[in-house]
Amino acid sequence: VETNVSKTVHFVSETNLLPLHFDIAIVACSSKPRLAICKLLLAHSVIKFLVLEKFLFTSLSEYDEADKLFKEKGVKVWVNCPRRMFGYYDKINDLLNKNSLINMNFYGKDWGMCCNTIHFVDIFMKLCGEKSFEIDFSSVEPKVIESKRAGYVEFYGTEKFLTPNGNTLLSLIHI
């Protein structure tokens, strides 16, 4: 590792204050303005790598638009979902019997099912080593509830994730 290398970090709230070329940008904001911010950023600067918060966008059309933009600009994009890199998950993975199916459950009260379930799904997929799953939302309450954050919504109930090999993740979130 080179220790005598100097790097510059810019923290800005206006794109015109950014340099025209740089290696990495981290866009840390809520999902509603994210696509507009990415558009402004990439219209102003040439960027190699982009890190975005989950959930990325608020509609499927925004995902399509962003995908096209990132491809046009040649930007590699990562989603900030870091739990799988926490060392203790590697230790848990080492303890698992690879010949047995994983049946993982997590329970919670009054916390964001919509924005937090992804962390557990990501860990589940890391531990079971599979790349796809089916989701059963039949036990999610049909009532839409206002989130703690204005303008966002939340759901409660049970989600079930099933992989092709039969591994299962059960998420139960209640009020």
Can you name each region flagged by the protein language model?
Residues 159-166:
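Active-site beta-strand termini and strand-to-loop segments that position acidic
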Residues 7-51, 55-69:
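Beta-loop-alpha module in the N-terminal Rossmann-like domain of NAD(P)-dependent dehydrogenases
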Residues 173-175:
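Conserved small/polar residues in nucleotide/adenosyl-binding loops
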Residues 1-5:
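NAD(P)-binding Rossmann-fold cofactor-contacting core
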